[in-house]
From Swiss-Prot:
The record marks D92 as: Stabilizes the basic form of H active site to accept a proton. NCBIfam families: pth (TIGR00447). Hydrolyzes ribosome-free peptidyl-tRNAs (with 1 or more amino acids incorporated), which drop off the ribosome during protein synthesis, or as a result of ribosome stalling. Catalyzes the release of premature peptidyl moieties from peptidyl-tRNA molecules trapped in stalled 50S ribosomal subunits, and thus maintains levels of free tRNAs and 50S ribosomes. Monomer. It is found in: Cytoplasm. The gene is pth. This is Peptidyl-tRNA hydrolase. Gene3D superfamilies: Peptidyl-tRNA hydrolase. The keyword Endoplasmic reticulum does not apply. Keywords: Cytoplasm, Hydrolase, RNA-binding, tRNA-binding.
Length: 186
């Protein structure tokens, strides 16, 4: 089974905010493949499991809030015996413009607290990521920016990135190597 973890903050207050880019991608997958509603797991996450083009996949949204995402993901990986190669984490990225996606095999957190939590809890940087650009704030604080919503000009551009990320994830689930996907999407 493959596991796709979307990072974000749980609760209606955070719906559709920039920091919830990961949630938006896994929600799009769940909708498009009619996987049903996310339900509470034994750990601090909501999940939905089903088939994407014949392959078993678990979509995960941690309920720990962004900065503690690893606390939810590690026990799920252990319980379901998910190898690091069968994990992809989807997150936002301040250092990329809205509408851009980047696939990355490993590395540091880049200042992203959700990724930092995953690295700390998993004990490794060796996991695949799909990052969606949310850009730096034009004015105001970074916190206000990441917890804010896309404006009317940015929204359709970001939605295009969500669909592009979804297509990359579908190809990965179907067996395309992550190296090939990086060549195609980066």
């Amino acid at each position: 089974m493959k596991m796709i973890v979307g990072l974000g903050n749980i609760g209606t207050r955070y719906d559709e905010t920039r920091h919830n880019a990961g949630f938006m991608v896994v929600e799009q997958l769940a909708r498009d493949f009619h996987l049903g509603a996310f339900t509470h797991e034994k750990v601090e996450a909501v999940t939905v499991t089903g088939l994407i083009n014949g392959q078993k996949v678990m979509l995960v949204k941690p309920t720990t809030f962004m900065n503690e995402s690893g606390r939810a993901v590690k026990p799920l990986m252990e319980y379901y015996d998910i190898a690091l190669d069968d994990l992809i984490v989807v997150s936002d990225d301040l250092d990329m413009p809205v509408g851009k996606i980047k696939l990355k095999q490993r590395g540091a957190s880049g200042g992203h607290n959700g990724l930092k939590s995953l690295i700390d809890h998993l004990g490794t940087r060796e996991f695949n990521r799909v990052k969606l650009g949310i850009d730096h704030p034009k004015f105001g604080s970074v916190v206000s920016h990441v917890l804010g919503r896309f404006d009317t000009e940015e929204r359709p551009v970001f939605e295009g990135a969500v669909l592009q990320a979804e297509q990359a994830l579908i190809k990965w689930v179907q067996g395309t190597s992550f190296d090939q996907l990086m060549n195609e999407y980066n």
